Amino acid sequence: MADNKAKKEQVHDVFQNISGKYDRLNNIISFEQHKTWRKRVMKEMNVKSGSKALDVCCGTADWTISLSKAVGHTGEVIGVDFSENMLEVGKRKTKDMHNIQLVHGDAMNLPFEDNEFDYVTIGFGLRNVPDYLATLKELNRVLKPGGMIVCLETSQPTTPVFKQCYKLYFKFVMPIFGKIFAKSKDEYEWLQQSTFNFPDKEKLKRLFNQAGFSNVKVRSFTGGVAAMHLGYK
């Protein structure tokens, strides 16, 4: 429990500090590929108009905005994040989108009823929580029976060429970005640690199954540097 609390505090501090630069940093680090990955995931989801969606670890609300457009004016999207500063950025971006509500909350203890949402998403956020399985079980709790869970996250490359490029990127390129964007060494180191320590796509699929999700589909992007996990309750 002490380790979980320490990780929570560390991650909270990191995102509080980088919130103003997060969108730009995300674009640069992924070479804007995160936008392409999210579009492909949204196409795969085929979100129904009028539905209710929850975007967990919504950050500055990029995926929340995509979901808002998909559910339409008769639908509802709630974004939840535990960084107040990230939410403030998200609120500025979504101020004219009336089907979006952004709330402060913990992914491991969501402030929602059981079986409340048709869709639950978590994008580039699962790697930041202290307990992956406990978080997935909490997402399962708030999802309606038959509802869809989707995770878009960094992953471990599977092809030899991408594996080597991945290692070189983190060894030589990431330190440059860290010096430019991070206010402290802790922030830069967290970006590396959270990516390298995150389970590969097969291990993550097993966690989805353990959390109670079924028919879990996995799709890799850009040589395996990112992956989608899509399942049902």
From Swiss-Prot:
Q: Which domain of life is it from?
A: Bacteria
Molecular function as annotated in GO: demethylmenaquinone methyltransferase activity
What CDD domains does the record tag this protein with?
Answer: AdoMet_MTases (cd02440)
Q: Does the keyword Iron apply?
A: no
Q: Which PROSITE patterns does the record associate with it?
A: SAM_MT_UBIE (PS51608), UBIE_1 (PS01183), UBIE_2 (PS01184)
Can you cite a GO biological process for this protein? menaquinone biosynthetic process
Q: Which gene encodes it?
A: menG
Function of the molecule: Methyltransferase required for the conversion of demethylmenaquinol (DMKH2) to menaquinol (MKH2).
SUPFAM superfamilies, A to Z: S-adenosyl-L-methionine-dependent methyltransferases
Enzyme Commission code: 2.1.1.163
Q: What class of enzyme is it?
A: transferase
Q: Which Pfam families match?
A: Ubie_methyltran
User: Do you know which PANTHER family this protein is assigned to?
Assistant: 2-METHOXY-6-POLYPRENYL-1,4-BENZOQUINOL METHYLASE, MITOCHONDRIAL, METHYLTRANSFERASE
**According to its UniProt record, which reaction does this protein catalyse?**
a 2-demethylmenaquinol + S-adenosyl-L-methionine = a menaquinol + S-adenosyl-L-homocysteine + H(+)
Family in the record:
Belongs to the class I-like SAM-binding methyltransferase superfamily. MenG/UbiE family.
Q: State whether keyword Transferase applies.
A: yes
Query: Where does the chain bind S-adenosyl-L-methionine?
Result: 60, 81, 106-107
Protein name per the record: Demethylmenaquinone methyltransferase
Task: List the InterPro entries.
Answer: SAM-dependent_MTases_sf, UbiE/COQ5_MeTrFase, UbiE/COQ5_MeTrFase_CS
User: Keyword annotations for this protein?
Assistant: Menaquinone biosynthesis, Methyltransferase, S-adenosyl-L-methionine, Transferase
Pathway listed for it is: Quinol/quinone metabolism; menaquinone biosynthesis; menaquinol from 1,4-dihydroxy-2-naphthoate: step 2/2
